[in-house]
Amino acid sequence: MQKLIVVILAAGQGTRMKSSMPKVLHTVGDRSMLEHSYDRAKDLGADAIHIVYGHGGEQVKSALSHLDANWVLQQQQNGTGHAVEAAMPSIEDDALVLVLYGDVPLVRVDTLKSLVSAAVESGFGLLTAKLDDPTGYGRIIRDGDGVVKRIVEQKDGSAEELKTDEVNTGMLVVDSSKLRDWINALDSDNAQGEFYLTDIIAMAANDGVVINTVQPTSIDETLGANNRVQLAELERYLQQRKANQLMIDGVTLRDPARIDIRGQLTTGMDVVIDINCLFEGDVKLGSNINIGANCIIRDSILADGVTVMPNSIIEESQVGNGAMVGPFARLRPETVLKEDAKIGNFVEVKKSTIGAGSKVSHLSYIGDTSMGKNVNIGAGTITCNYDGTNKHQTIIGDDVFVGSDSQLIAPVTLESGATIGAGTTLSNTAPQDSLTISRSRQKSVPGWSRPKKRS
């Protein structure tokens, strides 16, 4: 069986992006466009991946140094044929070569599998598409029997040829030995003065090679981005694709056009997601979860039965069965909510464990805290965990009641069953099953009158 070698062309300057960053590093979803193309090559099980870079190449290599690929420098950008030629010394004979593009990120792996199969059958597979408006694309020219004969570029085509609505996507699979011969025979006698990879189509046809064509499931698979408008269009296509898959998997989206997934979102059954929610990184949702509008959830796990009220943020946290978050709550990294815990409006929790059934309902900050079960934290309570140099722990046992407007000066312990009176500033241990209170005794002054303004 022939090896599969993937060449990703990523040397374009991308001047229309008007950016100091190379075009292929601009992101769609959570990943650069080049990484999307690389991912598809890995999904195919490619035996080797060569990335041809040019403009801003060192910046590209530095940003994506984690990729398992051979980086090939194209010294001068003299067209797609010249770019593939730069990679040929690294490609062995008797292999299949798949050409992808670093700025065409949405091609599906199933489409590429079909393209590879087409090449296995005849030695040449070509991905084409039919467009309502093919302006700007190279046209597929067939003979009277429907056999592909050549590709003509927009600037080189006759008026009759440009009427053709079938276009070249640039993606192809070809035998490496034949590709080497055809690449060596390319010339730059065209309107652009460049070496077109598409010219090998006519060479293959003249050599009697049957060019099998494959068409994608949807046109967004073939689209690239040369400017920010097109980049935004790709983002919408990707998000719509992800939203559709969620709904197929049983998720209710109140508006599929108003959800963004920048990473991996996995869900159980009967999940409901309201509008304008953003999921980043690796997010796992259990079953019977309700997420309100305008929430951001990143790298977190939500167990079954969780409710997230509108305008809440959850970052690198774990939320247990039946817990409730929000509205307007924030869970910062390393927060764990046990089952049936509640974090209410305008509460921030950081690097803390909130025990089963415990409640922090209003206007509080809980940081670096270990909290037991069935604890009630009153409104306006603050764990004072930072002394200006170090963070300190607050330990709260089970069945503790903390009155409103209390300050817990860490390091400090509240033993199980302790009650803290409202307005307390606690700096020492609160004993078990006791009331602890530290505030000035109330005093009333009979007959007192307010000062009067001087005339």
Predicted regions and their residues:
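Conserved N-terminal catalytic core of the sugar/cofactor nucleotidyltransferase
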Residues: 1-5, 31-117
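Conserved alpha/beta core of the MobA/IspD/sugar-nucleotide pyrophosphorylase nucleotidyltransferase superfamily
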Residues: 167-268
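Structural signal for interior beta-strand "rungs" in well-ordered beta-sheet cores
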Residues: 252-437, 442-443
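Short catalytic helix/loop segments, enriched in acidic residues and glycine
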Residues: 20-36
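Short beta-strand/turn micro-motifs composed of small residues
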Residues: 10, 53, 101, 128-129
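N-terminal nucleotide-binding beta1-loop-alpha1 segment
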Residues: 1-19
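Conserved catalytic-core motifs of eukaryotic protein kinase domains, centered on the activation segment
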Residues: 17-21, 386-387
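Conserved core of the sugar-phosphate nucleotidyltransferase
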Residues: 58, 67, 107-191, 209
